[in-house]
Every structure is written in structure tokens, then in C-alpha cells.
Amino acid sequence: MDMEVKTMPGKISIPRRFIFSEGKAIEHPDYPHYSNLLQKMNMPSVKGLEDRHNCVRFEKKCNPTFLKFHPYPPSVLPDYHLHYPYPPPYGRAYPLAPLRDDVPLGDPCSGFMSPGGDANLKPNIGRAIPNLVSFHDVKPQNRVPRPDKGFQTTIKRQTILAEELKQDRRWNSRKVPDISIKAKLGGWTSPMKVVPVPVHEHEVGTLSRIYTFDEEAISTDDSEPLVQLDKKYNIKDSFYKSSTQKAYEDVPWDKMLPPKLDPEETTVEKAADHISQCFSLKRYERLPAITQMVGGLWDRFQTRLFSAPAKPINFVSPSTRSKYIPLYTGHVQSTDADNVDNPYGDIKSVASPRHSKLQYTNSSRSANIPGYTGKVHFTATHPTNSNIPSREPSADSEMNRLLLQEMRVDRFRHQGPMSQMVTTVKPYNPFNKKEKETLEY
């Protein structure tokens, strides 16, 4: 097919191959499938198609690819606005240059959104990009994530976060929580009014007792002398005093103790199993990770030690369309054999992993539980454990029994060459059932 443009007066004809020119320049069959995943992962992208660093971006003059670059066809043509394909107007789909639609929006150095990509998306168009200035230099570990829905919950969490940041988070033994002060003053620490439990009479005497400490005690109630270990020892020194509290404050508890645990975002359990009451996550994920679906380009940019045991590292699946686990060496099937090599072919029809299913058991006829492996007659319509009265034998059952015994075939049929051999000398053939005949002369 001629690759040049065939121009006719008043009409532009474009070869059919250029309509699918994107598949022409792609050598790797999985590139169109993981190119979108690379943008989500902020992976450093190569320049140009086919990883050639834009060395083949120069096209011939009058190439139909340049029609997409111009916002409108030349106005000298009659009915230029009716020609196909009509180039897109200025906007998100407007290309920057011929064959350069894959413009990376992320900065390859920092990994964040580049200023050019931020300006290209424009405000109020497409996906909203969060502004980093609105967080007021809050550390990531102190930032409260936004819930999926609920505007009032977001404002409440931001208010709590602002109050916690203003407070001194260092350990202080003299600090008294506000909730304890409210409890001592008789205030309510809960939104609902709590009615105190009445005290019984036998507990009043116990609560009203006052225990005193007698330092000068010499003997116990049993008139036994106390054992004094040391005269210099003072029992009141073991009390908790302000000096003891001051000594504890000198200890760097913030460095010795683990940090305070922040409350969870939600109390919803992850992957809760209501049958086994096992609240652990599943061992195997249902779908492969994004890093396992981007092809060999992940290993290309992944930094590893030079002392790696095996190279290349087969960490990802060789085909992103097969949806198989990495290191899978089986055969990827498809309804059409040509779709395996076609980058736009459909191989998901039969490439999904198989799941073992129980064999179908017709329980409506045999009345047995599914998966029963006992002995049941193939024409029986009753369960095996049902009590069925035995029938009387028929008149010809004895005759059938004799016929079966006569028709019974021996297990060892002696069909081998040694068994069929006939010997005329002793000990003769042990399998020869012919009777011996005496010949008279």
C-alpha cells in the first residue's frame, strides 16, 4: 500500500494503515496495556516510541500524521470542516508535536507533578490535583487522611489535628488530663447523664474507715516484737514525694518509650471472615499487584545490588494481558491463535486462572448428598441408608445362577506361549486338560 497521501481536488484520502499507526510503531506487545499503569506509579518514562529517544520522530513531508498536529485543515480546501479525520480542537487531546502524545506529567527527579503538567491539566479540568500548600507543612505521620465521604467528619478531624499540634507532646508527669479534672469536680465525662450506683449499708463502714500510719510502733497486735533491719531506715522515705517525681522527669521517656499510637481511621475490619472468625488478611491476593503487571520495564528501573544471585530477575509476569502470576511457564491460550501475537488481541477469554469445582451430582434422583462415593445401583432412586424390604427370589434365579457359574472365566486364562506348549514327557504340561489315552498295538 502506498504510504503517501493521495490528494484529490476537494478531498483528503488517508491510508487505512495510518488510522492504526499507533500499533505500527510498537514492538513490545504489552506496551499499550501497561503504559497507563506506569503513569500511576510515577515511573520514569523513556523518550519517544520504541525507546529510541525520538530519533524517528521526523516524518516525510505531507505525512498524514501532521494532520493531527494542525488544529484545522487548510482553509483553501472546499468544505474543509467535513473532512475525516477531523483534528481535535485545542484542549487536553491537542498534541504538542507529531507522534508525541505520550508527554509525561510527572517530574522524573522528584516524582511529583511537574509545573508543565500541572499547567497542561488546567484547573477544573480532569482529575483534581491536591495543593501541597494547604497542609501548612504538616508532617506526613501527623496528617489525618480524608475519609471517603462525609464533609463534617473531615472538618472535625482537621480541628482535632490542629489542637494536637498546638499541644506539647512531650511526656509530663505533672500534667493532669481535662477529663480527670471534670470527674473530680463532678462534671459529666460522657454525653449521657450517668446515675451513680447506690452504696449498700455493709460497704459504708468499709469506705468510712481511716487507716493511720504509726511510725513508732514497737510490737504487733499479737504482742510479737517487730524486726528492725536498720535504725537509719525511715519508712516514710518509700512514699512518693515531689522529689521522686522530679527525678522521674529527668529521665528521657520520649526516647525510651514508643510514640503514642494514633486512633484508627475506621473500625471496619479488613477482610473479616464471619464463618471462621479469623480477622487476618487473605494470604493470596485476588489480582496481581501493579508492579507485577508493567512488564520488564519495572526491572529496568529497579535498583538492585550488583551481587544479585540471578539475572535477569523475573519479578513480573512476561505478559500483562494474561493475568497470570510471575514465573508462570504455562501456555496462554485464546480462542483465536493470532491474538497471542497481536498487541490488541483478546486473550482474556480463556486465559483466566481455572477454579476447581465439584462434579455435578444429581441429588434429585439418587437422593444422596453431593460428593457421596458409596455404592448405589445406577437405577436406584432411594438413599443408600433406607430400609427397603428384601424381595423373594424368582423361580428362574437358580437357573441363572448355574448359567453364571458355567460362564465364569478363569482369572488366569493361560494364553501365554509357555502355557500353550504341549509336552509328551513327564511331568507333562500341568495346564493340559486333555485326558490321557492308552494306545494298544
Curated annotation (Swiss-Prot):
Pfam families: SPATA48 (PF15073). Essential for normal spermatogenesis. One of its GO terms (biological process) is cell differentiation. This is Protein SPMIP7. The keyword Transport does not apply. Keywords: Differentiation, Spermatogenesis. Testis specific. Expressed at the spermatid stage. InterPro entries: SPATA48. It comes from Mus musculus. The lineage of its organism: Eukaryota, Metazoa, Chordata, Craniata, Vertebrata. Disruption phenotype: Mice have smaller testis and show impaired spermatogenesis.
